[in-house]
Amino acid sequence: MLTLKIVVNIVVLFFVLLFIFGFLSNDPARNPSGRDME
């Protein structure tokens, strides 16, 4: 059970870091390409 909890925590932390990293890297890239998305 403890191992499962650790694995779940690692997966959640990985996704959170991935989301934050992607958001930070996409934030400046979206400003100039804002017209492209519209």
Curated annotation (Swiss-Prot):
Membrane topology term: Single-pass membrane protein
Disulfide topology: none
Signal peptide (residue range): none
Pfam family, one: PsbI
Subcellular location: Cellular thylakoid membrane
Main location: membrane
Gene Ontology cellular component terms for the protein in this record: photosystem II reaction center; plasma membrane-derived thylakoid membrane
Gene Ontology BP terms: photosynthesis
Superkingdom, taxonomy of origin: Bacteria
UniProt keyword terms in alphabetical order: Membrane, Photosynthesis, Photosystem II, Reaction center, Thylakoid, Transmembrane, Transmembrane helix
Transmembrane regions listed in the UniProt entry: 4-24
Coiled-coil blocks: none
Family of this protein: Belongs to the PsbI family.
Assembly description: PSII is composed of 1 copy each of membrane proteins PsbA, PsbB, PsbC, PsbD, PsbE, PsbF, PsbH, PsbI, PsbJ, PsbK, PsbL, PsbM, PsbT, PsbX, PsbY, PsbZ, Psb30/Ycf12, peripheral proteins PsbO, CyanoQ (PsbQ), PsbU, PsbV and a large number of cofactors. It forms dimeric complexes.
Function: One of the components of the core complex of photosystem II (PSII), required for its stability and/or assembly. PSII is a light-driven water:plastoquinone oxidoreductase that uses light energy to abstract electrons from H(2)O, generating O(2) and a proton gradient subsequently used for ATP formation. It consists of a core antenna complex that captures photons, and an electron transfer chain that converts photonic excitation into a charge separation.
Record-given protein name: Photosystem II reaction center protein I
Gene symbol of the encoding locus: psbI
